[in-house]
Amino acid sequence: MPNLRILLKDEPNKRVLLLGNEAIARAILETGIGIVTTYPGTPASEIGDSISEIAKDANLYMEYSTNEMVAVEVAAGAANVGVRALTAMKHVGLNVAADAVMTLAYVGVKGGYVIVTADDPECYSSQNEQDNRYYALLSNLPCLEPSSPQEAKDMTLAAIEISEELELPVLLRTTTRVNHTRGPVTFGKLSKPNLKGKLVRDVKRMVMVPAHARLMHVELLKKVEKAKGISENSPYNTVTRKGKNQIGIISSSAAYNYAVEAADLLGLGASILKLGMTNPLPEKMIGQFLRANKKIIIVEELEPYLETQIKAIAKDHAPTVEIYGKTTRQYFPRKGELSTRLVAEALADITGKKIPIDFKKTDEAYAEIAKDLPARPPILCAGCPHRASFFVIKRVGGEKANYPTDIGCYALGIAPPLNVGDLLVCMGSGISTAQGMSRATGEPTIAIIGDSTFFHAAIPGLVNAVYNNATVTLAVLDNSTTAMTGHQPHPGTGITGMGSPAEKVSIEKVAEGCGVKFVKVVDPYKVEEAQAVLKEALQHTGPSVVIFRSPCTLVDLREKRHKGMKIVPYRVSDKCTNCMACVKLLGCPALILEDGKVQVDETLCVACGLCASVCPYNALESGGGQQ
């Protein structure tokens, strides 16, 4: 991440290379947003991280909330007393927040409020690739879709203005390629954030008992009609190219970039309608575009969101126009990312144009290069305490136990040789699915979860286990950070998103407060002690909690190096029989094979000592450890 203090520069017209997420952070400063809330999740994490780093200097408030629903509720409270707010989350986070968002559409806001929802086509870092544009339809909230970092900034500013004009939250739907693309962004003028609001009581609007909800639903539908006018006149809904061959392309978001490149590659000369405000759609503008063309090609990622609505518009405005997309011969896939190649192949198929590139040759060249490259599957880092925890868990539970798992670094425990993880659905699901497994199988069941995810979503499931006396064990892998998304703080870390000290919320006290009778904390590197405690937990009737506590190695190493401590790696002595136990049991990337013999990669070893604990011949010796 670059020096983010550049975001604080009040230099209008300055051009800077920024990630899409950093561009949104800059927009927060330009639009005078006073409160920013988030729960970290790729591909949206850098929005909150960027603001966290500069929040004090920017004189605004930022927090890493316990989960996305809390983040929305905190921001909604601010927006309803007149303070501009923004909440950032990944796409599945909107599932968590949906209960609040759906009713907030009825309540509305008084200060501008933007909800950034970052979709992840191709599931690069997610458990699904849902298309959150449908949340805009479902909630009747306006939705903007940027296609570049510059638009990410500009549309955030526009979203605030639309929000205040309609008195509604506005969804800013990004995708991974927009969030994580770095491009030139032109700065505007900074605005002073307003952190001082005032509650103007309006019980009918703000308290959603049934009688009020019925009335406010009517008001919401009136706002939708007003939003249609905004969409028709939005500068982000525009014909960017006018062709002469009566072929029209309609696209949005990152897919628009592929459509333009593919059309240029084929020399198609098509007209292109770019849609940046995609809920509500500009029906009149689209109808006019349909009438001006004989063939319409809709290029969008994931679901046929635009296509379905445009086909409905065509029935009224241009019933004879030919529309090509995902539902007509499936020219475009309903899964994964698009690419210039995929779009070019579809356009060629539809129009009969010839692609000037032999993609088969590029495939062959790629395959030739790739065959000599080592595989790099995602694995736990060398020295990761989760590896020690998994070794203990698998040694105790063996093949007889069931292992529902959760969202976080520890999901990588499914990989060999650890092979821990039987069912993964969503944040916090492990403890609840464990109860169903336990009751249905009668077998030992150990649910795996991390510390941040525990606070995010596990507590209701744990209460359920206590209430219904479920005999399950919850293994909390506590590495004192939200590691997978970038080491953000959480309620158990003792620091806030503002960098201020905070009360550490104790996982063990929370578990005890929920009524769990068996709660113990272990050091996963003390293998024998940890195994004994886990065995005891499995013999307990009712829910039990074992907290495997050891700091994330990356954070720990950073702190030790900052203090000038030296890491002296382990070494393989001549006692080694090459039994391969360390490799077969742990899969640590610091254990490598050279000439058929186990060696320690000194550039990766962090001297955690786990390999020495499992070696039956005491062949792995400390070179001095962490000094």
Please report, for each region that a protein language model flagged, where it lies by residue.
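Short beta-alpha connecting loops at secondary-structure transitions
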Residues: 59-60, 118-123, 139-144, 294, ...
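Conserved thiamine diphosphate
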Residues: 120-169, 175, 203, 208-211, ...
